[in-house]
Amino acid sequence: MHYYVTDNRAACVPLNEIPTAGYAEFYEDLAERLADERYHIGHYFALPDGDVLRAYCLLLDDTEHRVLVASYAIGYYDTPLLPSLTARHPQVHPFEREITERYGVRFADMPWNKPLRFPFDRYNRSSSIDNYPFYTIEGASLHEVNVGPIHAGIIEPGAFRFICNGEQVLHLEIALGYQHRGVERTMTADDNVLR
């Protein structure tokens, strides 16, 4: 697969110079590179582009100190389930979750396909922080402790769900998103004075 390659991590990249691959090629190449510890994802996101949704991935090469940028395009309504990179590389989960949440793209075998931030312009408006699907475990000696939504001062407000067996915490799930500010929309707006 071809990438736009730069060693300047602060550079602007012309969108028309970023190579576009098919999803199958994108998936296989990224899965192979992420198996090598020298690579990790800097960002992976999608944006509407005419009648398609274009996803961009910034892959960081820690050995050669380069940024590799690639993309793929999928149709909004004719897209089948896409293989999930998260199933092979857990570091991808927040990126795939956001793409699902914002645009409704479905990834097969996604082990933790839950909302991430509840942006105002999300694909499924009926999904809200109030009906967040917390992880559950059944058992006579287990109990759940729900804390929040609270603001701890350092992090944004969130709800914390502990699953405990006596005093031992078996699982903690944190739901953030109470304070989503729509940064992506702000940065891509034509009238944005910050750009």
Predicted feature residues:
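Function-dense linear segments that define catalytic or interfacial modules
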Residues: G158-R195
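Terminal low-complexity/charged segments
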Residues: M1-L172
